[in-house]
């Protein structure tokens, strides 16, 4: 499998790196198209979790969600490694976009804020109704929203996604953007994603000047928030 992967793809550059994963920009040698390769290794539990999530979202077909082209296992020397091949988005994160547009006295128009907000709501409508059960993203934030070179919104990073009917409690998400129930480990619900989109809209309206919850973990924040639902 290791040789087959490298026979098909040329690694262009490393995009990011963490303890158990590396993300690369790669080029398909035959099709001559760029894609993203996410390679996870060194932790069997994490690899199994990510593989399960990849299978959860592999059949999603929506213009604002990156396509998953392939899922491979054991591409390296580590038998627990997996690789997810995804659509490459040539663009910038919403956080970078807002910073660029509002820097040096610039302005993000109401029309643009509404356009991005509507596209995010269209994504949620699709995800929450997918296959009758729905899929919850559970980590919507400016860093997980991309705008391609044409300005089209793309929602990325489904690492925390769960099936809508799973009835699972969640303690994941990003401070400031996670809904109150995520802080206290309650059941995942569609409203959690809606809350996060609302916080993203606030981020745009305030031109990125909203306070974060740095220094606070999810478990320590419930006392500072009232339940909204």
Task: Map each language-model feature to its residues.
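Activation segment signature within eukaryotic-like protein kinase domains
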Residues: 116-117
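Activation-segment/catalytic-loop signature of the eukaryotic protein kinase fold
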Residues: 71
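AlphaC helix of the eukaryotic protein kinase fold
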Residues: 41-59
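Conserved short submotifs of the Hanks-type protein kinase catalytic core
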Residues: 77-93, 97
């Amino acid at each position: 499998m290791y040789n087959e992967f490298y026979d098909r793809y040329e690694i262009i550059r490393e995009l990011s790196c963490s303890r158990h994963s590396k993300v690369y920009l790669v080029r398909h040698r035959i099709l001559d198209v760029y894609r993203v390769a996410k390679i996870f290794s060194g932790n069997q539990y994490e690899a199994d979790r990510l593989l399960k999530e990849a299978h959860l979202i592999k059949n999603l077909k929506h213009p604002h969600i990156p396509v998953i082209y392939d899922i491979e296992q054991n591409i390296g020397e580590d038998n627990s490694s997996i690789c997810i091949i995804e659509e490459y988005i040539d663009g910038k994160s919403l956080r970078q976009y807002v910073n660029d547009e509002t820097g040096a006295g610039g302005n993000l128009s109401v029309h643009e804020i509404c356009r991005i907000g509507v596209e995010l709501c269209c994504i949620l409508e699709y995800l929450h109704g997918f296959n009758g059960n729905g899929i919850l993203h559970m980590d919507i934030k400016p860093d997980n929203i991309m705008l391609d070179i044409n300005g089209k919104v793309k929602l990325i990073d489904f690492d925390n996604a769960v099936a809508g009917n799973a009835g699972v409690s969640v303690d994941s998400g990003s401070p400031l953007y996670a809904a109150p129930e995520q802080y206290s480990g309650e059941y995942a619900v569609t409203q959690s994603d809606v809350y996060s989109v609302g916080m993203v809209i606030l981020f745009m309206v305030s031109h990125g000047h909203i306070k974060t919850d740095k220094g606070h973990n999810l478990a320590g924040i419930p006392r500072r928030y009232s339940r909204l639902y």
